[in-house]
């Protein structure tokens, strides 16, 4: 789900920059691939990739791509509503809600995504592959799976108090 109103300032964080080569008849063609996460620290986050012959241009393309792929993250206070395990490729990411004041217990790429989403208290574990792009994609997939208690109650046709 893309958001059109860019009135809110989005913070950008470069997660990875890779040097990639393409072997051609005359030798090797060098380019740079960038992975960037953007978020407003208020429940909106997105990631994007860009490739170019210069690093700044690759980052600019990645930022533009990330702004087109923003998602809304449901939150309960400063954490997520429930535990979620998501996979992408060989990467698995486990996201668990944490009590207020715990902080962000997450490494590398997962930390970038959840901090820019505005989640202040969360515990996470990355399992399997630790490739940054797959970790970011798995984290975003996990955040997409989250549902508030009100949404679950509405789907089941019961009141929120009957969920417990």
UniProtKB/Swiss-Prot annotation:
Family (UniProt): Belongs to the universal ribosomal protein uS5 family.
Source organism per UniProt: Streptococcus pneumoniae serotype 4 (strain ATCC BAA-334 / TIGR4)
Protein name: Small ribosomal subunit protein uS5
PANTHER family reported in the protein's UniProt record: MITOCHONDRIAL RIBOSOMAL PROTEIN S5
Residue span(s) of domain S5 DRBM: 10-73
Ribosomal protein recorded as keyword: yes
Matches recorded under Pfam families: Ribosomal_S5, Ribosomal_S5_C
Gene behind the chain: rpsE
Any GO CC annotation of this UniProt entry: small ribosomal subunit
Function in brief: With S4 and S12 plays an important role in translational accuracy.
Biological process per Gene Ontology, one example term: translation
MF (Gene Ontology): rRNA binding; structural constituent of ribosome
Keywords for the protein's UniProt record, in alphabetical order: Ribonucleoprotein, Ribosomal protein, RNA-binding, rRNA-binding
Quaternary structure, from the entry: Part of the 30S ribosomal subunit. Contacts proteins S4 and S8.
Domain notes: The N-terminal domain interacts with the head of the 30S subunit; the C-terminal domain interacts with the body and contacts protein S4. The interaction surface between S4 and S5 is involved in control of translational fidelity.
């Amino acid at each position: 789900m893309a958001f059109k109103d860019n009135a809110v300032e989005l913070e950008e964080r470069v997660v990875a920059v890779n040097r990639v080569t393409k072997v051609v008849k005359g030798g090797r063609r060098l380019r740079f691939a960038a992975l960037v996460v953007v978020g407003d620290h208020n429940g909106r986050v997105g990631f994007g990739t860009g490739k170019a012959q210069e690093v700044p241009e690759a980052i600019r393309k990645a930022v533009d791509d990330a702004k087109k792929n923003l998602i809304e993250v449901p939150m309960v206070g400063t954490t997520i509503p429930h535990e979620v395990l998501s996979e992408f490729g060989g990467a698995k990411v486990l996201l668990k809600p944490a009590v207020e004041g715990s902080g962000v217990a997450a490494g590398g790429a997962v930390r970038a995504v959840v901090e820019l989403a505005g989640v202040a208290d969360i515990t996470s574990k990355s399992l399997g592959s630790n490739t940054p792009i797959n970790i970011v994609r798995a984290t975003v997939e996990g955040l997409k799976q989250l549902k508030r208690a009100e949404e679950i109650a509405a789907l089941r046709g019961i009141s929120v108090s009957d969920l417990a």
